[in-house]
Design a protein with these regions (language model features):
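A short acidic-Thr-Gly-centered motif at the start of a beta-strand
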Residues: 6-15, 46, 75-78, 160-163, ...
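Short, glycine/acidic-enriched loop or turn micro-motifs at the edges of active sites
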Residues: 26-27, 61, 92, 174, ...
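Core catalytic region of metal-dependent phosphoesterases/phosphodiesterases
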Residues: 28-109
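Acidic, His/Gly-enriched loop-helix segments that form or flank divalent-metal centers
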Residues: 105-110, 116-117, 121-224, 228-234, ...
């Protein structure tokens, strides 16, 4: 017997628990703080018995202030563990770079230079003098010194998925045909086409980011809230209250 999946329109959050799932932040501390203010205001005016704020990964790279984003998330989680913070491929890429200075990896090619700048390390200056390989080696040494241990431990501690009610949350998506509790961690932070092209319903509605869209995308089987915040200045989230679902946005300046 094939299990019938859950359609977005029928999906419900747990009774009495408000859910918020926030898309890729990429160094936009301003937008993350604005989204939290917006959610806090909502919870003040329409109190919920319980709530979870789920961050869908990619806190670092590209945008201007990755360091402050990580500081903000560490504080938020200390203040209330109902702030759930999932791993994205860029967050794992930063850990990988700190462990091994790969000159042509994700970090150096896709916005890690901006992350390093937020910690006071300037890769571009050294490239001018030394060429890439030497500049990366020097920058790597400086960055390992500059990134607080607490940030490294935090990045290492991030889970790859979480589920509440009829929703399954992860950074990139899932591999169709594989049970949700048996997903490969690489797929959860990297998958694109095999997931996006899948039209059938899943056992839960998948809420994800990773692949930027001009505005949040709601499909029968998934919701994508990555609205390219670092560049567009729009950070999006899915808000779930029982059977009621809506997309919320905060706006800042485009870069």
């Amino acid at each position: 017997l094939t299990e019938t999946g859950i359609h977005y329109l029928d999906a419900r959050g747990p009774d009495g628990m408000r859910l918020y799932a926030i898309g890729d932040v990429h160094g936009r501390h301003d937008l993350l703080a604005a989204m939290h203010r917006r959610i806090e205001t909502e919870l003040e005016y329409a109190p919920a018995t319980d709530w979870r704020i789920i961050h869908l990964g990619d806190y670092v790279d590209r945008g201007p202030d990755s360091k402050s984003v990580i500081d903000f998330l560490i504080e938020a989680q200390k203040r209330d563990p109902r702030n759930i913070i999932l791993a994205g491929n860029h967050d794992i890429g930063m850990l990988d770079f700190l462990a091994n200075a790969e000159p042509d990896g994700l970090f150096m090619n896709y916005g890690g230079v901006q992350t390093a700048q937020s910690y006071g390390v300037d890769f571009t200056r050294d490239m001018h003098w030394f060429g890439k390989a030497e500049a990366v080696a020097r920058g790597h040494m400086a960055l390992v010194k500059a990134v607080p241990r607490s940030h490294v431990y935090f990045l290492r501690s991030l889970p790859f998925s979480v589920s509440f009610g009829d929703f399954f949350f992860c950074h990139a998506g899932i591999r169709p045909g594989v049970p949700l509790d048996h997903q490969n961690l690489q797929d959860l932070i990297w998958i694109r086409d095999a997931f996006h092209d899948h039209q059938e319903l899943f056992s839960k509605v998948i809420v994800h980011g990773h692949t930027p869209v001009p505005e949040a995308e709601v499909k029968a089987n998934r919701v994508n809230v990555d609205t390219l915040a670092w560049k567009s200045g729009t950070l999006s989230a899915l808000a779930v209250n029982g059977g009621d679902k809506q997309i919320i946005d905060v706006q800042g300046k485009a870069l």
